[in-house]
């Protein structure tokens, strides 16, 4: 039967949160209690939805942390949110949502804080769970490539209004709306290297009635390629040599354990260039 969620009280909504509807937010620090350990957060979710002991819940929580790519799971269980990186905190949020085995998962930019190597793992995990448990997923994102990979249908919105909707292949490959086409034109291409990245206003404008129409002055967009050559004579603005960085966590009453986050990293950044750092 149809349920109007807006009309429900907070107490009534408790019956739907978790096992029916779960959400992964973009910023995990707004959802995690800074006074509670990571293990506490996970165990509460498990015992709210499953009839298991605290010890059994701890085992399940550790296994879930491993699924979302968090190393040293037992140590992480004892840590607090501020002791984890932003990416680690987001993975904890994803684990909490998946533990509840919801019928509907609302994911608001869930992989934004993750590096590309973990992003693929998380997306594959979400997709496998969706199929295994017949779970529906509302995936909110600005990443068009990710939409094409994970979604069956897509809705393109602008200023709070729907501009176009339909099957993902139809919308992304044969878009009908001018705004959708402008978004797709803005995607960087490997074949060209413009002086600046194009924006939607380069490909559309408003007519006298305020309606969006295709831009006709695309020739004004400077797509001249820059030289990719690095001669070695360019000025180096940043040089890092054999950088090491470690963090320490409590172990026992007086001891502490080292976690080496950076292990002998070296690189140079030339003037006017962009260096992509993945990981």
Task: Identify the residue ranges that each predicted region occupies.
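Short, glycine/charged-rich "phosphate-handling" switch motifs in NTP-dependent
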Residues: 153, 165
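Short catalytic/signature loops enriched in Gly
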Residues: 71-75, 168-238, 250-253
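A short, surface-exposed alpha-helical micro-motif characterized by mixed small hydrophobic
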Residues: 147-149
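A short, proline-enriched helix->beta-strand linker immediately N-terminal to the Walker B motif
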Residues: 99-103
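Hydrophobic anchor residue at the start of the ABC signature
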Residues: 94, 105, 118, 122
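Conserved ABC ATPase "signature" region
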Residues: 4, 56-75
């Amino acid at each position: 039967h149809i349920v109007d969620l807006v009309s429900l009280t907070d107490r009534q909504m408790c019956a739907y949160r978790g096992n029916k509807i779960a959400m992964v937010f973009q910023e995990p620090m707004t959802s995690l209690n800074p006074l509670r350990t990571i293990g506490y957060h996970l165990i509460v979710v498990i015992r709210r939805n499953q009839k298991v002991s605290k010890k059994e819940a701890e085992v399940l929580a550790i296994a879930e942390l491993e699924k979302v790519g968090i190393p040293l799971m037992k140590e992480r269980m004892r840590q607090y949110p501020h002791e984890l990186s932003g990416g680690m905190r987001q993975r904890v949020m994803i684990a909490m949502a998946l533990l509840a085995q919801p019928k509907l998962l609302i994911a608001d930019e869930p992989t934004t804080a993750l590096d590309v190597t973990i992003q693929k793992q998380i997306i594959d995990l979400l997709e496998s769970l969706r199929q295994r448990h017949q779970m529906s997923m509302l995936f909110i994102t600005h990443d068009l490539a990710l939409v094409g990979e994970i979604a069956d249908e897509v809705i393109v919105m602008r200023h709070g209004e729907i501009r176009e909707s339909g099957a993902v292949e139809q919308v992304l490959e044969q878009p009908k709306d001018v705004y959708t086409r402008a978004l797709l034109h803005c995607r960087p291409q490997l074949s060209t290297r413009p002086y600046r990245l194009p924006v939607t206003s380069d490909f559309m404008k408003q007519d006298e009635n305020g309606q969006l129409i295709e831009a006709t002055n695309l020739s004004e967009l400077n797509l001249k390629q820059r030289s990719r050559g690095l001669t070695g004579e360019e000025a180096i603005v940043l040089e890092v040599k054999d950088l090491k960085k470690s963090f320490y966590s409590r172990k026992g009453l007086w001891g502490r354990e080292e976690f080496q986050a950076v292990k002998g990293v070296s690189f140079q950044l030339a003037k006017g260039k962009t260096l992509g750092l993945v990981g």
